[in-house]
Amino acid sequence: MMEINEVIQSLRTKAQGKTCLGTGNFALDIIMKRTYPNGFIPGKRNKFEENILFQEVGNTCGNVMTMLPYLGVKTYPIAKFDVSPHGYQLTRNLKQYGADVKFVSNTKDGGTTLFRCNHVLDETGAPALKHKGSSAGKPWNGLQARPSRKYLTTKNGAVQRLADSLDFTPDVFFFDIVQASHKDLAQLLRPKGTLVYFETDNIGAGIKDEKGRLAAYRAFLRCVENSDIIKFSNERVPDVSFVNDFHDKLFIQTLGEEGVRFKLGNHDWITLSPIFNPDYKDYEGAGDWTSSAFIAAICGMDMLSVGKMTTEYVSQALMIAQQIASHSVGFVGSKGMIHADKEYAMMDDTIEMPTYTKKLMYLHGSASAGYSRTSIGILKYLPEDWQLLTPDCLADPDECISMLRDLCEKEKPDLIIGCSQGGFYAHQLSGYKRICINPALDLSRDADIKIGKHQFIINRKDGIQSYTITPEMHQAYQAMEARQFDRVTDFDKENCYGLFGEQDTDWGYCKDIFSQHYNHISTFPGGHKMEYDEIETYLIPLIKRII
């Protein structure tokens, strides 16, 4: 067996010039690691800390579209992301890994999903993975409060327009979820000579309603009918009796620790033994490496139709795929293997951003982050040509106000919006138009500012998940409170607005303090945190009136 580097280089050389169009599931993977500062005792509740290792594009189609360029195949992902910072990061990541993003968009009606993969120890102390899409209503995804995926639509001739816009015929079309639009695009591309690769983990088995389950299964079979290669796992698709109805396909079923098997046309199933990696660290992405390496291998073998395939060559291609997938589990993260390759150069991730006519800045509450539920709500209702900056505030108050003043000097925002702790800082940024929502003017009394260690409740850009308030920092908060109104000017009195929740039991009393220094006070019916409908009804009109 060739060394892994030789295998990869061989694939790159032979697959050079081949193309793959792909659509389906994309997510921003948040790779985290849990550590145990006091050690780990099996069966006990152990104190732990969590930190973010990195954040990057993932999920099945996202991985395949970024793994294939590493193996020599040019990719063209089709994706509709939103205009959140995470949505733009996905577009940049795709470009950075070598994908052509001409069919990727960032719009208000797009969707962005975040997915946490946490490396932990299970009850016995063995390494394990925990997956999560959202937590206690906290936002882990784009402009929505739950996973938000937007696929190519069948409406208004969108599929035909996309097909007509292609100035090349892709060698492979990859999709990973049952959608009518994906099936329709496959139907348009196959007659042109494109090989269609369909990977699925859902045939409707989990749907409780029998009518819905049958409808999902029929939709799955329609996708199979319009595909050439169909890949699935034995865990998700244990019953493979349907394959006997198709005689012009290649079916691939992964078997976990038992390897992989395939059925080509009318041939019987052939099982290939697994390739184990004794240096296992993370299985995340192994299945996607299997798909990517197999696609690259058949591209290199010029085996881009089922009619050209033989069981011998399919076996060879799958063994190459298994070898690369086995190697990949020796690294943390689905694309850890690429990160570790010092000789592989990532691409420039610069993308064309919108031309903004207004620039706003949002400052968050304590123990939070700039990109939080409230900023999501604001961004959701802002005009598309208005930019929203979402910096993460620092735990040290003096360092934080200094950082914010420097940022304002650099960015020159048209408006600053601060909530709770953010309102405390915002009203001190003299010389700018500001809205302070339930400002915490006695911030040193906040439970999140007490002396000791605290956890950030939302992921931050720097990946740090905890902070410590020292006695000196607590004194600095008190000192800042005492002088917070010293810089108020006549301009500030007219251009710093207070917006207070009538049901705010946390800092509602600060309205009287605020009104002693500023001239404009408004209220909304809610509590300390604004709901989306309150943002739309009360905050957005105020923003537009001020700007």
Where are the regions a protein language model picked out?
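A short beta-strand-loop structural module common to alpha/beta enzyme folds
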Residues: 51-58, 78-79, 384-400, 523
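The alpha/beta-hydrolase serine catalytic core
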Residues: 433-547
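Conserved phosphate-binding/catalytic region of the ribokinase-like
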Residues: 2-17, 241-354
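Conserved beta-alpha-beta core of the PfkB/ribokinase-like small-molecule kinase fold
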Residues: 171-246, 250, 259
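Conserved N-terminal subdomain of the carbohydrate kinase-like
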Residues: 42-52, 70-172, 193, 344-351
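Glycine-rich phosphate/adenosyl-contacting loop at the front of the ribokinase-like
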Residues: 2-78, 82-96, 279-280
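Gly/Ala-rich beta-loop-alpha elbow adjacent to hydrolase catalytic centers
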Residues: 417-427
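Active-site catalytic motif of lipid deacylating hydrolases and related acyltransferases
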Residues: 354-410, 528
